[in-house]
């Protein structure tokens, strides 16, 4: 019959890729790369004094892969890092905010600038983190490769300017 193992008993369980989807190692790589670039950015080093409020909106899945759950985990990870970093007050991406976004969205899979600005003012948010992930998929007789490109950016609510953006590349392959 099947055998079961805990990752706490065998940490190597998380090392191997099991699919072409995004796993914990991919999300940690993305979070670490984004956070390092974000914290080293001119945007963060030149923040004005006073209250700085940020909220993580959404990361749009523009791939053919079923990675919605992984992207929601990444959103929560970004929120956690921002909360623990102490530079910003974080407005949680909870069901109320999601509902407002879905109700006011006027086009596409991303939140348009007018909606983002209105939500920011309504919620007292200075900056929004949001993004999208796309992919390029190739297949041969015995292999399938997915190259993900994740774009995460920070938009200033009052000006609608993108004040920070980072690209993170992740490649997964299955053979056999």
Region spans (language model):
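Short, flexible active-site-adjacent loop segments at beta-strand->alpha-helix junctions, enriched
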Residues: 60, 94, 158
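A structural "domain/chain start" motif
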Residues: 1-87, 174-175
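Glycine-rich loops and low-complexity Gly/Arg-rich segments
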Residues: 79-83, 114-118, 153-158, 173-176
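Amphipathic beta-strand/beta-sheet edge segments enriched in Tyr/Trp
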Residues: 3-4, 126-174
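Alpha-helix boundary/capping detector
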Residues: 64, 82, 108, 145-146
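Short, solvent-exposed, polar/charged sequence segments at loop or secondary-structure edges
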Residues: 71, 75-76, 85, 90-140
